[in-house]
Amino acid sequence: MDCVKIESGTSLLRVFHAAPQAPAVDVYINEKLVFSNLQFTQFSSYVKLKEGEYRIDIFQTGTMLQPIISGSLDLDEGQMLTIAAIGNLDDLSLLVINDNADKKASPKVSSFRVVHLSPNTPAVDILVNNKILVESLAFKQNTSYVDIAPGSYNIEAVLNSNKESVLVFGAVLKTNRIYTIYIVGESPNLRGIQSVDGNTYLCRY
């Protein structure tokens, strides 16, 4: 596919529905419908926004009586962001995740990171093929991007407290790709959602 350019004075933003108890949602930015009928574990496409201040309101699909989540965003130029709807119904919020527009895809290696978005799962250690990547990753935290040889990997989350395995996810990681693996859902029914991040496709000239 053609590369994507972040134009001067703008940024790119997408929304990820990661709230396991929440219904399908419509996303309004500054009172304008931007994404509709976004289901749990679904991503929107990236949209271009000018730098500035924005209000984000998330409604149950087809309604506009009361947003289930509202938040504000002060957007600088040159960013690439994922806005995740997270939490349980009694404590929903928006989490801004920086997709790091400076990170470049490589023809020699793959890159990935892990984000913990399960609201009822304590801090976890992340193992890659049984080797520790990071310890005590808490809800709403993410690892840094890690470069790794392309191939198939078992990515496992174990509770930091007692080393109980709570998720094993099989990931296929390719060259020229930058991925995020999101831990979503509620224990004991966790899921791994693998995303190719938009920084994979940014123009580099």
Task: Go through each PLM region and give its residues.
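Intrinsically disordered, low-complexity polar regions and short flexible loop motifs
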Residues: 1-205
